[in-house]
Amino acid sequence: VIYTVVAGASSGILCAVNANGSEKWQYVLPGDTPYGGAVIGADGTVFANGGKAVVAVTADGSLKWQFDLDEPVQNCVPLVDNRGYVHFITDKATYYVLTDEGKLYGKKSLGTKSFASPVMGPDGMVYIAAQEEAKSFVFGLGTGASGYADSAWPMKGQNPQRTHLQR
């Protein structure tokens, strides 16, 4: 199964497509996501962003949880760690970590804007870029995780090197 996000005029759509090209299911996201994408947790949960929210959708297309925000998260693909926690950064550069149940674990302002997606090394360290007053910064943040999720696609580009090679 391939999971993809399709941008729309007012909302994005998270789609599951079978190997033969037929649609398995689709889930309408709570807002547009022109540069977002989907990632997969170790248990098969699919995570995506849309508008001012991040959602967790089960492998059969049912909503597991939705985390609503006060600011847009349209330019980031989430990341899921080995605990099932979801990491992302908003367009206004607020870095969030949610538990596997969709509850806030932590957040931190890293600047004024971001067009990046977090990447996690095999040691659980998260790297993320943000901007502040025309200056760009890359942050390395300890997360308490011991690595990214053992799944087919835990982050943008599939792995820390962004090779897009599915295992």
Where does each model-flagged region fall?
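Extracytoplasmic/lumenal domain signature
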Residues: 1-167
